Amino acid sequence: MTITCSLSDKKCIPCEGGVPPLEKKEIDKLLSELQNEWIVNESGHLYKKYKFPDFMQPIEFANKIAALAEQEVHHPDLTISWGACIVEIWTHKIDGLTESDFILAAKIDLLQN
């Protein structure tokens, strides 16, 4: 019997550096486990734009993300504007993607539901 674990059930593991970023094949597999709106942008970072009907909801959403980021000890870049919160995630120590980036993305998606 095989037991599978969704990304949102896992815990981010702090990166100390010295490990290679994920390869494209691994990135594509993990990206397929996220909601469709996530992309890998031109900088090689996970990127998603969440849309809202006003200014306060993106602020509130960003605060939820901040609390989650502290809990996971993994911190995304957030950009807030009227009607939107843009999330950009990557592992800063290696300037690339690790599984923890995808775990955080999956957990952020749960905050909006």
Swiss-Prot record:
EC number: 4.2.1.96
Molecular-function annotations in GO: 4-alpha-hydroxytetrahydrobiopterin dehydratase activity
Record carries keyword Lyase: yes
CDD domains given in the database record: PCD_DCoH_subfamily_a
InterPro entries: PCD_sf, Pterin_deHydtase
Pfam families according to UniProt: Pterin_4a (PF01329)
GO biological process: tetrahydrobiopterin biosynthetic process
Keyword set, alphabetical order: Lyase
Catalytic activity: (4aS,6R)-4a-hydroxy-L-erythro-5,6,7,8-tetrahydrobiopterin = (6R)-L-erythro-6,7-dihydrobiopterin + H2O
Family: Belongs to the pterin-4-alpha-carbinolamine dehydratase family.
Protein known as: Putative pterin-4-alpha-carbinolamine dehydratase
